[in-house]
Swiss-Prot record:
Catalyzes the methylthiolation of N6-(dimethylallyl)adenosine (i(6)A), leading to the formation of 2-methylthio-N6-(dimethylallyl)adenosine (ms(2)i(6)A) at position 37 in tRNAs that read codons beginning with uridine. [4Fe-4S] cluster 1 binds at C11, C47, C78. CDD domains: Radical_SAM (cd01335). PANTHER family: CDK5 REGULATORY SUBUNIT-ASSOCIATED PROTEIN 1, MITOCHONDRIAL TRNA METHYLTHIOTRANSFERASE CDK5RAP1. Residues 141-372 form the Radical SAM core domain. It comes from Wolbachia pipientis wMel. SUPFAM superfamilies: Radical SAM enzymes. It is found in: Cytoplasm. This is tRNA-2-methylthio-N(6)-dimethylallyladenosine synthase.
């Protein structure tokens, strides 16, 4: 058997795509290896969201190439889509470049590359979605207590800071029956929890027997799977929130009381410049609606600091929004211009030192709220889903709370792996909880 090594960067959709690539390639006689130096085929599944993603890729490619000259090297993912032929110019030893929508063609690309000994590329946006081109055997093969399931891909929003519409294409929703079959297979393989994925997951509008279902209706349907205990979804857009999703949170106990809802800024001026097509007030109304229906619900978000034209007043509006919402956790980044996006063309770029100073202030507030939320759990007993992830200390195992907090307990008898266990929280830290199994 030949060795296959896949390195995945970026979002959960990339993790899902890497599993699909592994499954579509295995019939060619490949087995996954953990050491790139022992691989005959290396795939770098890339992300293009953060600054200097391409430069990091070329640095990594040089290291990979130095390990073993006779290996086949594939660049996949969003950098592959954005860079295209430029990858071959910068790294001539790369054999294949393939975009996210073309991974079903990987077997033929690999065969073609081996025969021609030349460069092979496919960064098309095919009319037939990639989900329809891959065989059923590629889906639902993940092992473990928590699994990813892509239900929607692509983006029609065209936020002025973002490359996703250009690298992932237009929004596409998979049919309900196809998703349900994959969910059944994942649960049969041991998944207690399913994470529904999409670039705009709550824009889901899948077909089912002549009807169009939204995300709320899909969740209620998937919840009928008897042995499935938890459902999550990510990532949502405020513009696509709808009534059936609110009601699903209120009525479906398997749906976790935690929503990742990126807002990016608290300034209406900046939100308009970002082409978000919602206001800070509308975002806060969504938060309030959720909390009225499900008082125990919590939120995380994404923030971009230093978008072109952002003033100190605009930034203070973001700080005020964070104070109002009080997030369980949040992710914040300095704005980095992405080539080809409208934001990159603007002349009113914010100085780097200003972005850095604002980011530190925002992260200080976010960290304070996260610690306070974690501290509020001390003394409570919460259900925690454990996997095979080990902690820093001997016999320690790590699981996830309903709110995506890392929870550490002692498992010296190896009893809790891949199970949901009631845990009494004894101590709170900045990004984790410590507890003991409660019987």
């Amino acid at each position: 058997m030949k060795g296959l090594y896949i390195k995945t960067y970026g979002c959960q959709m990339n993790v899902y795509d890497s599993v699909l690539m592994e499954n579509v390639i295995k019939p060619l006689g490949f087995n996954v290896v953990s050491d790139a130096g022992k691989a005959d085929l290396v795939i770098l599944n890339t992300c293009h969201i953060r600054e200097k993603a391409a430069e990091k890729l070329y640095s990594e490619l040089g290291k990979i190439h130095s390990l073993r000259k006779e290996m086949t090297i594939v660049v996949a993912g969003c950098v592959a889509q954005a860079e295209g032929e430029e990858v071959f110019r910068r790294a001539p030893f790369v054999d294949i470049v393939v975009g996210p929508q073309s991974i079903a063609t990987l077997p033929e690309l690999i065969v073609k590359a081996s025969r021609s000994k030349g460069h092979v590329i496919n960064t098309d946006f095919p009319e037939v979605a990639k989900f329809d081109k891959l065989p059923d055997e590629c889906y639902g093969n993940s092992q473990g207590s928590s699994a990813f399931l892509a239900i929607q891909e692509g983006c029609d929003k065209f936020c002025t800071f973002c490359v996703v519409p250009y690298t992932r294409g237009a929004e596409y929703s998979r049919p309900v029956n196809e998703i349900f079959r994959e969910a059944l297979k994942l649960v049969a393989n041991g998944a207690n929890e399913i994470n529904l994925l999409g670039q705009n997951v709550n824009a889901y509008h899948g077909e089912c027997e002549g009807e169009v279902w939204d995300l709320g209706k899909l969740i209620s349907h998937i919840a009928k799977i008897e042995k499935l205990e938890r459902i999550r979804y990510t990532t949502s857009h405020p513009r696509d929130m709808h009534e059936s999703l609110y009601l699903a949170h209120a009525e479906e106990p398997k749906l976790m009381p935690f929503v990742h809802l990126p807002v990016q800024s608290g300034s209406n001026k900046i939100l308009h410049a970002m082409n978000r097509k919602h206001t800070a007030e509308e975002y806060l109304e969504i938060i309030d609606r959720f909390r009225k229906l499900k008082p125990e619900i919590e939120f995380s978000s994404d923030f971009i600091v230093g978008f072109p034209g952002e003033t100190e007043k605009d930034f203070e509006e973001t700080m005020k929004l964070v104070e109002k919402v009080r997030y369980a956790q949040a992710y914040s980044f300095k704005y980095s211009p992405r080539p080809g996006t409208p934001g990159a063309e603007r002349k009113d770029q914010v100085p780097e030192e200003v972005k850095t100073e604002r980011l530190l202030r925002l992260q200080k507030l976010i960290s304070k709220q996260q610690l306070e939320f974690n501290q509020s759990m001390v003394g409570k007993t919460i259900p925690v889903l454990f996997s095979d992830k080990k902690g820093k200390h001997q016999n320690q195992i790590i699981g996830k709370s309903p709110y995506m907090q890392s929870v550490c307990i002692d498992d010296s008898e190896d009893k809790y792996r891949d199970k949901i266990v009631n845990v009494k929280v004894l101590e709170a830290r900045q990004s984790s909880l410590l507890g003991c199994a409660f019987h």
